[in-house]
Curated annotation (Swiss-Prot):
Coiled coil: none
Source organism (scientific name): Rhizobium meliloti (strain 1021)
EC code: 3.4.11.1, 3.4.11.10
InterPro entries: Leucine_aapep/pepB, Macro_dom-like, Peptidase_M17_C, Peptidase_M17_leu_NH2_pept, Peptidase_M17_N
Residues that bind Mn(2+) 2: 263, 268, 286, 347
Protein name: Probable cytosol aminopeptidase
Amino acid sequence: MPMKFEFSFSKSHRPAGGAAVLLQVAGAKEAAGAAVVDPEGVLAKAAKIGKFTGKALSTLDVIAPHGSPADRIVLLGLGDAGGVGDHDWLKAGGAAAAKLRSAEKITVFLDAPGLEVTGKAAADFALGMEMNAYGFESYKTRKSDDEPKAAQKPVKVTIVTGTVIAAKKAFMTAQAVGEGVFLARDLVNEPANVLGPVEFAARAKELERLGVDVEILTEREMKKLGMGALLGVAQGSSRPPRLVVMQWKGGKAKEKPVAFIGKGVVFDTGGISIKPASGMEEMKGDMGGAAAVTGLMHVLAARKAAVNAIGIIGLVENMPDGSAQRPGDIVTSMSGQTIEVINTDAEGRLVLGDALWYCNDRFKPQLMIDLATLTGAIMVALSNHYAGLFSNDDRLAEQLLAAGLATQERLWRMPLGKEYDKMIDSKFADMKNTGGRHGGSVTAAQFLKRFVKDTPWAHLDIAGTAMGSPTDEINQSWGSGFGVRLLDQLVRANYES
């Protein structure tokens, strides 16, 4: 069972047993809190013997010496004082949580000598602990005999810092971010037999308790709008599609909204162009873009962001059936443009095409950003470490790249151009839904570009980062929640009034 934490912040605290975490920068003579938990100065000798130098994320775990009010002491390195950024505090918190799986109470001495510690740093450290401890075990009925008692109830964590008031305020925002990330992770991790389009829409509807206006369009309503591209993907499944429109109105009344659009294929068999059996179970995560948009809308509402934001998610299931669309079919999108379906496994762009057009036509946003686990080609290019960024607007692209660096949800800008656009021209329709294997992620983006007009737009291909990416200090989950922190940072830095 994943650990749960109950945090408090204090200017001073003397532990009464439990574990104490002492932070130290590289080259410092002592760690934060050493005078409290190590009155005899034993830690310095232990650090020398253990060759602990304060290197980033390095640890030294010792039984508390005689006279210490703690039972266990963990020295945790932060690295060079001049290089400690926001993300480093998250990772440090994650490293602490990973080290203290069996702890029943924890005291963290945060104010490392030689380092200026802010309230946000304290909040980020706490969020890092929570992000590391996240787990998805809803369907496990057998618990291991050696499961720590700490997992049964919240572990009390006292963070000792001189910035208590600022830390408490920052932690309220950090908690909102964490909730959004965990919502996205939960949605991606959920099995497809439980989370269909209707059930996903119901989860999104729950955001109304935070003040989000949620509207759910049915199949009949989408037919009236002419969403033939999205509906073509859904027609092979017995589970009806949904289009969910989420509105957060935290900005000025007449201020144009920022819009986020997510691909929500709750399970992707590939349709008639069926995928190989090996690994197909992972296609329950083909709604990672929709999960990220839903998580983001939770964050914006929970922290009362001063922005008008739209979240739109197209929810379908792509199944082979007697009524499923075939290669060679031609569908008419909401835009009026016709599309020849070459490969039914290139379905996400069909869903997004209608969703993008609907968003632009109805809301006239100042920008649109779509997120999608769209192509395997982006994983060939970037592996699991970067998401692909495609954009028709340099300013928006630069803002996204900066947000990626700040959150370490990193993006790499990919090309767009007329040469690639020609690759999706069709002999029989206005366009075809795939341009072949070469440049597959680029031609997919070019397809989407045909549905955005002149609105500043960016497409994030998160196929390699939304699920199955390498674990690290702040993510031990298969579904990562990628994109939630990235886009919250984008909004926070550029679009809040």
